[in-house]
Swiss-Prot record:
Transmembrane segments: none annotated. InterPro entries: Ribosomal_uS8, Ribosomal_uS8_CS, Ribosomal_uS8_sf. SUPFAM superfamilies: Ribosomal protein S8 (SSF56047). One of the primary rRNA binding proteins, it binds directly to 16S rRNA central domain where it helps coordinate assembly of the platform of the 30S subunit. Belongs to the universal ribosomal protein uS8 family. The gene is rpsH. This is Small ribosomal subunit protein uS8. HAMAP family: Ribosomal_uS8_B. It holds the Pfam family Ribosomal_S8. Signal peptide: none annotated. Keywords: Ribonucleoprotein, Ribosomal protein, RNA-binding, rRNA-binding. One of its GO terms (cellular component) is ribosome. It comes from Bartonella quintana (strain Toulouse). The keyword Disulfide bond does not apply.
């Protein structure tokens, strides 16, 4: 069975693992997922991730979630641009998440990056998800 929204699947797996207070989770690997996880790690929302090769050209990503005093570092994680409805924003119209406390993740011509990096580089793109 093919998956229509691999990034949405990963975000849902993270939300479900956080709801169950899991320390780690596993998801199929892709370049897009790895780039989004790089941004989440650099912004301090996850401890880290490790790509595991399963052989046969397949690999998985093991994500280590972050908690502080029993509370998850991620309070809200939502997909914005979906396969049926893409959402594009310019550098000037980038929305702030939770008054600047959260972060939006964008796919730009210069790569996957957080909203504050896109503002600094004056570049817009597809608004993938919001994290708070």
């Amino acid at each position: 069975m093919s998956m229509s929204d691999p990034l949405g699947d990963m975000l849902t797996r993270i939300r479900n693992a956080l709801a169950r207070k899991k320390g780690k989770l596993v998801t199929p690997a892709s370049k897009l997922r790895a780039c989004v996880l790089d941004v989440l790690q650099s912004e301090g929302y996850i401890r880290g991730y490790n790509q595991v090769d399963l052989g046969d050209g397949k690999s998985e990503i093991e994500i280590e979630l972050k908690y502080f005093e029993g509370l998850a570092a991620i309070r809200e994680l939502s997909r914005v641009s979906k396969p049926g409805r893409r959402v594009y924003v310019s550098a000037k119209s980038l929305p702030q998440v939770a008054n600047g406390l959260g972060v939006s993740i964008l796919s730009t011509p210069k790569g996957i990056m957080a909203d504050h990096e896109a503002r600094e580089q004056n570049v817009g793109g597809e608004l993938l998800c919001r994290v708070f």
